[in-house]
Amino acid sequence: FEKFGCVIGDECHGFKSKSLTTIMNKCREAEYRFGTTGTLDGTQTHELVLQGLFGKIYNVTTTKKLQDNDTLAKLNINVLLLRYPESVRKEFGKREYHDELDFIVKHEGRNKLIKNLALDLKGNTLVLFQYVEKHGKPLFELIRDGAVKERKIFYVSGQVEASDREVIRQIVETQKNSIIVASLGTFSTGINIRNLHNIIFASPSKSQVRVLQSIGRSLRKSDDGSDATLYDIADDLHWKSRENFTLTHSAERIKIYAKEQFNYDIHEIKL
């Protein structure tokens, strides 16, 4: 790598990985280093690592400024705070994070709500999930089986070839009312869909990079110039002073929305 005099790193927030850090450190003669990203994770450690690899961070603009000058689509966020029954919250107890996620992604009422929401929305909709086997596939089947025959429903995970994902992306850009059920790993970063009107966060996350990158999928201006809408599913399983993990994570996401100056409303829904 010593023969290279210039390095350009796209989506450079990912350059904190060991493999990319190793490559960068071997580019000893690379006097010119350019890294571009729309998202940092908000921690000082992350910023210091990237500064060590590329140099001083320069903030060119913000999402809010790009929305104000009509470069990006306007975004409306609806936080759907799911209130589980008192009996469920009381019996839920103090569980480990993974046990809580298992409970949430397998909850029949929650998945039915996501299905109905996806089917009721107008425009192209992206439903993002985290777990393939226990959430993504069952959710896709629920939505597919509930949709009218003419509506196009797509499923994307790491098991789907990259070439097929690109075909799906191109098809959706020609549609007006399709649904993509996709894993966060495949559709949260680097995928641009011109006519994407809605995003549903079906899985909880507190990662600033993942949240903002996922939102970025919907900010490209659509042909009809309509606003983008994000539906953030939050889960309230707290009991008295005991808060559940995913409720805390939803509070972290709301802090991100406020920091980015996004418009958001919180709606309580009883399951």
Task: Report the location of each language-model feature.
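A short beta-strand-to-loop transition that corresponds to the Sensor-1 phosphate-sensing loop
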Residues: 11, 36-40, 130-132, 182-185
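Conserved interdomain hinge at the start of the Helicase C-terminal
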Residues: 89-130, 134-145
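Charged phosphate-binding loop/patch that engages nucleotide di/tri-phosphates or the phosphate backbone
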Residues: 254-255, 259-271
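Conserved RecA-like helicase motor-core motifs
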Residues: 126, 140, 144-166
